[in-house]
Regions:
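Intrinsic disorder at enzyme termini
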Residues: 1-6
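Residue-level signal for inorganic ion chemistry
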Residues: 7, 18, 102
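A ubiquitous short alpha-helical element
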Residues: 8-12, 77-80
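Glycine-rich flavin
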Residues: 23-150
């Protein structure tokens, strides 16, 4: 089995957190289409947004199995909207900042995203590609002090 005793302790702790802090609000959030701001900070305070991110930005730099547990338990609360919002923040937005951002960008946004102070998203669309990031056809070519977008 891939999961250690530490992983299972994390699983139980995260399940308890979700039941106490998230589940009581799900119906309201689903009905209004808005997730209260306080929960983002609570996720950050508990370290959940930083599981796999570098320690120098406030992350915990843990192995991938913590992320697997995080996603498994998040899905079990039966709120696709909430799970998608958290997933988009942690994986779509923050991953790009972590992988592609220079130190200045990481200092400004990655730590604030890990703490829950800022909420990330990834907004991309093309006429024929929709939101399929891998299928993007637009290019940006640097020409002197600007870019040519095609």
């Amino acid at each position: 089995m891939y999961f250690t005793e530490e992983h299972e302790v994390f699983r139980e702790s995260f399940k308890d957190f979700l039941q106490k802090e998230v589940v009581p609000h799900i119906d309201k959030w689903e009905k209004t289409g808005n997730i209260d701001r306080f929960i983002w900070r609570k996720f950050g305070d508990m370290g959940y947004f930083g599981l796999s991110y570098p320690e120098e930005y406030g992350g915990l730099n843990l192995d991938i199995f913590y992320m697997v547990i995080f996603l498994e338990e998040l899905q079990k609360i039966n709120s696709g909207g909430f799970a998608a919002a958290i997933w988009a923040h942690v994986y779509l937005a923050m991953t790009h900042v972590n992988v592609e951002g220079d130190v200045r960008i990481k200092n400004k946004y990655l730590g604030a995203s890990i703490s829950g102070e800022k909420i990330g998203c990834l907004c991309i669309t093309e006429p024929f590609g929709g939101s399929d990031v891998a299928g993007m056809r637009t290019t940006a070519i640097r020409k002197e002090n600007s870019y040519v977008i095609n």
